[in-house]
Every structure is written in C-alpha cells, then in structure tokens.
Design a protein with these regions (language model features):
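Phosphate- and other anionic-substrate recognition elements at nucleic-acid/protein interfaces
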Residues: 1-150
Length: 150
C-alpha cells in the first residue's frame, strides 16, 4: 500500500490531502497560526505510515512574506522528519505541481478547485484542493520514476 501526503503551505494554515494506492482518501485544512505545536498536532491527524510527502514550495515577491513562509516551512519540515525520519519529502513550486497534476502552470484557484473535484477529491476549501493536486502531482512523479526504472 502506497500512501502519499500532499501539503499546501500558508503562513496561518496548512492544507492536507492523503492519497492511498493512487486514489483520493481525504483532504482537509488546519489552522496553525505559525505555531510549531499546532503544526505537529496537525501532522498527528495523518496516517502513521507515509511513503512520500509533497509540499508546496511557495513563491513570494516580498521579503516579509518570504520570512513568514520560510518560518512555517522550516517548522513543518522539522515536524515531518520528527514523525517520519525516512520519508521521501519533495517540494514543488506552484507551476510544477499544477503541470504534474494535469493543469496549465498558470491555472487559477477556481480551475484548481474544479480539477480536484473532477479527480475525485472532496475539498471544503482552496487549501485542501491545492493539497489534493499536490498529492496527485507526487503520485505522478512516482509513476514517472517507476517507468524510468523499468
């Protein structure tokens, strides 16, 4: 059984999506307000065994935003490796995960949400929809790697 976790990163919340054996399992959003304890608690809601975690590598234009995202990313990565020390962690820029998920690189929020629903996910908000597409992108890149290995 292959379990993939997709994570959409925002300074005050994280979107999560769990994919099991190539099929949507669950997606949700957790408000963290940047606190490391809330990040660890949010990860505790995830399955105990995960093969790959894919998270968004946010692109920002302003230094203040980069610092906020960077702090959350560092805390998130620390919590991830604290729970799953041997997990395969990848980070995708927004354009990368959109293309790997089957969307144009410049797809807007509405199109991403609609695409997640078409793929079988039931997101309640945009962060969960983004996380779902990130999980699909991670599954696609794992499939590509398997094809190359053959």
């Amino acid at each position: 059984m292959t379990t993939i976790l997709g994570i959409d990163v925002q300074p005050t919340r994280l979107g999560f999506a769990v994919m099991v054996d190539g099929k949507p399992h669950d997606c949700w959003t957790t408000h963290i307000d940047g606190f490391p304890t809330k990040i660890a608690a949010a990860l505790a809601d995830c399955p105990p065994r995960i093969e790959r975690i894919a998270r968004e590598w946010p692109i920002t234009r302003f230094v203040s935003h980069a610092r906020r995202y960077g702090a959350v990313e560092a805390r998130l990565d620390d919590a991830i490796f604290g729970m799953w020390p041997d997990v395969d962690l990848v980070a995708y820029k927004p354009t990368e995960w959109k293309v790997r998920c089957g969307l144009p690189g410049n797809a807007d929020k509405a199109r991403i949400f609609a695409h997640a629903v078409v793929l079988g996910w039931k997101p309640l908000d945009q962060d969960a929809a983004d996380a779902a597409c990130i999980a699909v992108a991670a599954a696609a890149s794992m499939d590509e790697a398997r094809q190359v290995a053959r």
